[in-house]
Amino acid sequence: MHERGPVSRESYVLYKTRNVSRGIMLYYPAIYYRSGTARGAAASPAAPASRTSYFTTMRLLALNKPFGTICQFSPHETRASLADWVKVPNVYPAGRLDSDSEGLLLLTDDGALQARIAEPRHKLVKRYWAQVEGAVDAATLKKLAGGVDLGDYVTRPCRAEYVEPTDTLWARTPPIRYRAAIPTTWIELSITEGKNRQVRRMTAAVGFPTLRLVRVGIGALDVFSLGLQPGESVELPLKAPWEGMA
């Protein structure tokens, strides 16, 4: 439960100690308890105005995580952490990005929303731009799209296509290694799993190591449309990742 933040921990304690009846209402994106839902009292659906003090103002932030930043708030001896870029208290990452990956990261103080964004069972699409070493052909894109056997699991089918980065893509600091004799290819992968280093493992498994990896989208959100440069963040409506989606 520690990954879900204080809201989820408190709701979990209420549930496990049976101090709250089953008469609760999921009022997206969080759970609200009417004061009369304590065990022994009649439970009824609650409107947002009737939430208890367990739930204060919930927040959702989008951050363009810079290269080299570790995905935690605890300080690190040699690397930047999220605390260097995000000054809003009590928010936690909804999913992760490796320190050597860049791009869109969502943070929230609501455990239910955090889970809905991050957990693979909810199948929220995450879009990645990967600059890989070598000239990727159509057959390789088909392999990536059909699912890749990584040894410990086979990835879900996904969308894989060529992409040509525009001037809106920021330069990485430091830049990738450059080899004059070896071309590179930019591809876009749209996946719903987001397991540990999944995109990098997928491209390596089909013979094209990833040199640079940028998460450009989560659900309906796009880092370019948000206008975020590395290290910049913006607060969003709680339903933003799903706005406009079918």
Residue spans of the language-model regions?
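Compositionally biased, low-complexity flexible segments
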Residues: 37-48
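RNA pseudouridine synthases
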Residues: 54-246
